[in-house]
Amino acid sequence: MEIEGYEKIIEAGKIASKVREEAVKLIXPGVKLLEVAEFVENRIRELGGEPAFPCNISINEIAAHYTPKLNDNLEFKDDDVVKLDLGAHVDGYIADTAITVDLSNSYKDLVKASEDALYTVIKEINPPMNIGEMGKIIQEVIESYGYKPISNLSGHVMHRYELHTGISIPNVYERTNQYIDVGDLVAIEPFATDGFGMVKDGNLGNIYKFLAKRPIRLPQARKLLDVISKNYPYLPFAERWVLKNESERLALNSLIRASCIYGYPILKERENGIVGQAEHTILITENGVEITTK
């Protein structure tokens, strides 16, 4: 069976993997989050890809969906547990990968729990594989370390220019008749926490997605919508990719209110527990499972 876009899938994985390994070395106390995010996104482009979504840098109890805003001054601190989640695409074929950096040196086991869960479940995949059984494996590994998997976060099957296709890979056991099989491109991302084991929505995290073109009164907002719909019709974008200065924020907010764009909320652990994450993209072929972001 020939897999559509195979070479591009593999190339996107190589780019994402290389950038992840380079970016990890930049994460240190006193370094600005913006510096790391811009390095990631620019490096992906240098290597011949495009960011599949804004670089996510989520610290401590934040599990996902924070990217630095325009002129963001936030810096890493020496007790931070940092999740770096990045994606690259080549002609729409996506690679999605994440790693946790423990600057505090107090959460080695938490980091190990999500990593071990990731590699264990990948090793156990035998297509067609029930996604509920995958969740069971992830849950058992994380719980064996004394932590909880985050039950309302999940991995996802990806298509060309589509990060989430409707099939999710749970981090806990679920009774389901959904399977992944040969030809599927899948992001698997176990999250472990010492908190409640669920996330809740926080404020907007500076990441947006185009929804539709609608009539807009404000000329500046119409212009901004044209830029967004032309450049980011399918995949998420960062506010700093489309705003030149703070005065344009009014236009962005009017697009959210008009449901022209969707703003992703930050996802926080429900009891402010510390969160660790590990993620790889896999491609299921007739010859077995390939980790594209290894």
Swiss-Prot record:
Q: Which InterPro entries match?
A: Creatinase/aminopeptidase-like, Met_Aminopeptidase_Type2, MetAP_archaeal, Pept_M24, Pept_M24_MAP, Pept_M24A_MAP2, Pept_M24A_MAP2_BS, WH-like_DNA-bd_sf
Entry binding sites for a divalent metal cation 1: D85, D96, E279
Which EC number(s) does UniProt give? 3.4.11.18
What Gene Ontology terms for biological process does this UniProt record contain? proteolysis
Q: How is the cofactor bound?
A: Binds 2 divalent metal cations per subunit. Has a high-affinity and a low affinity metal-binding site. The true nature of the physiological cofactor is under debate. The enzyme is active with cobalt, zinc, manganese or divalent iron ions. Most likely, methionine aminopeptidases function as mononuclear Fe(2+)-metalloproteases under physiological conditions, and the catalytically relevant metal-binding site has been assigned to the histidine-containing high-affinity site.
The record lists the catalysed reaction(s) as: Release of N-terminal amino acids, preferentially methionine, from peptides and arylamides
What protein family is recorded? Belongs to the peptidase M24A family. Methionine aminopeptidase archaeal type 2 subfamily.
Protein name as annotated: Methionine aminopeptidase
